């Protein structure tokens, strides 16, 4: 099975709830991008139209490896804007009263092509698509865990007081998609760990522009204090570290809860970057009706939980060898308390027929369209359909 062999294989259209009017102070635009990161697109608009980035409102980040359409708001004082480039387009929609904010959307519509399908998988895939009416567990998927390397969560290492490991992850771990210059730097630091003068000399010699790397390494040349070096990490990154670990714990709590209510014969396990997901293959209507009305809270230190949440959270934290009070040690960022629906139910599901795949010899492809409410991951639905065969 293959996804995203072309950007056209993964199309995302934002579903926004808004009211146009004639008296608002903001212009609403459709922003379509192809293979461009969200923040880079916003930065480009800012420079091109001389609009400060803080004045460009949007509801959420969209996938880079896709064709995406979302909405942005810009104050009327900058005039009506338009852009028509190959990979980035901006189209005026109308006038709204308030700027767009993160999270203020209904959801997203997805148009996805799954490729390299074998003929003997047709029946099972078709059956799985029919069963989408009973939804799927509403896990956070791999996109949430970009700061996790070799199964190590930076926030967890901080809770353990292991700041050297935190700094080592930040300065030496890399992904395939990172630029060669940065990968070379991280390899050099890993090879010369502790020789901070040499590492700083390398940064200057190669004219590496990253302030974070330079400041962290320079700090270590003065004093081998990894906790102090960590202070040079951007606060937005620190918040991502917390968010990633909190999301992982929520996933583990959901999995533990599902173990209590899903019979063993109906459990299916699917791997992901931080462990395994538990899916259900079939579910009784009575249980489904119960689950679709339920949510599960995120873990924070200042909330009194009741069973079954309290019991499940305690079990997961014991497995992680941390206590809920440990979260009070975090002197940066903030754990966010929210209640997240236990299951995600795709709306308006449409599917095409299996067709010959022009990109993969002797294989087939199939189109799948559906809508999800905000916060739910399309890739979880794809795992439910295509990984349970």
Swiss-Prot record:
Q: What is its EC number?
A: 5.4.99.27
Keyword set, alphabetical order: Isomerase, tRNA processing
Look at the named UniProt entry and state the broad enzyme category this protein falls under. isomerase
Catalytic activity entry? uridine(13) in tRNA = pseudouridine(13) in tRNA
According to the UniProt entry, its GO molecular function terms are: RNA binding; tRNA pseudouridine(13) synthase activity
Identify the PROSITE patterns for this entry.
TRUD, UPF0024
Name a biological process GO annotation. Answer: pseudouridine synthesis
InterPro entries in the record = PsdUridine_synth_cat_dom_sf (IPR020103), PsdUridine_synth_TruD (IPR001656), PsdUridine_synth_TruD_CS (IPR020119), PsdUridine_synth_TruD_insert (IPR011760), TruD_catalytic (IPR042214)
Residues at the active site: 63 (nucleophile)
Pfam (any one): TruD
- In this chain the TRUD domain maps to 135-345
Leader sequence segment: none
The family note in this entry says: Belongs to the pseudouridine synthase TruD family.
| Job description of the protein | Could be responsible for synthesis of pseudouridine from uracil-13 in transfer RNAs.
**Protein name (database record):** Probable tRNA pseudouridine synthase D 1
Record the organism: Methanococcus maripaludis (strain DSM 14266 / JCM 13030 / NBRC 101832 / S2 / LL)
């Amino acid at each position: 099975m293959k996804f995203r062999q072309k950007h056209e294989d993964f199309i995302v259209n934002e579903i926004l709830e808004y009211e146009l009017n004639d008296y608002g102070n903001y212009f609403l635009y459709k922003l379509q991008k192809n293979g461009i990161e969200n923040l880079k697109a916003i930065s480009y608009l800012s420079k091109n139209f001389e609009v400060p980035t803080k004045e460009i409102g949007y509801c959420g980040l969209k996938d880079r490896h896709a064709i995406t359409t979302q909405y942005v708001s810009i104050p009327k004082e900058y005039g009506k804007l338009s852009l028509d480039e190959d990979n980035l387009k901006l189209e005026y929609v109308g006038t709204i009263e308030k700027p767009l904010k993160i999270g203020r959307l209904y959801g997203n519509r997805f148009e996805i092509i799954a490729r390299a399908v074998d003929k003997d998988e047709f029946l099972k895939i078709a059956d799985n698509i029919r069963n989408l009416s009973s939804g799927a567990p509403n896990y956070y998927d791999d996109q949430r865990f970009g700061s996790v390397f070799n199964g190590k969560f930076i926030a967890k290492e901080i809770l353990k007081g292991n700041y050297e490991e935190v700094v080592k992850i930040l300065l030496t771990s890399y992904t395939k998609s990172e630029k060669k210059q940065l990968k070379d730097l991280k390899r050099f630091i890993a090879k010369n760990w502790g020789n901070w003068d040499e590492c700083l000399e390398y940064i200057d010699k190669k004219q590496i522009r990253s302030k974070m790397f330079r400041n962290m390494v320079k700090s270590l040349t003065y004093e081998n204090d990894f906790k102090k070096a960590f202070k040079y990490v951007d606060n937005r990154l620190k918040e991502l570290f917390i968010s990633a670990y909190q999301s992982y714990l929520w996933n583990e709590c959901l999995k533990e809860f599902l173990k209590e209510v899903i019979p063993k014969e109906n459990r299916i396990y699917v791997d992901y970057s931080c462990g395994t997901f538990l899916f259900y293959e079939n579910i009784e209507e009575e249980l489904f009706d119960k689950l679709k009305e339920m949510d599960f809270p995120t873990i924070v230190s200042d909330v009194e939980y009741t069973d079954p949440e309290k019991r499940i959270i305690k079990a997961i934290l014991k497995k992680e060898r941390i206590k809920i009070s440990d979260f009070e040690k975090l002197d940066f960022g903030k754990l966010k308390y929210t209640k997240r629906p236990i299951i995600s139910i795709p709306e308006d599901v449409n599917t095409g027929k299996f067709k010959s795949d022009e990109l993969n010899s002797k294989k087939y492809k199939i189109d799948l369209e559906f809508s999800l409410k905000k916060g739910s991951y399309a890739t979880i639905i794809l795992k439910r359909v295509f990984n349970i065969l």
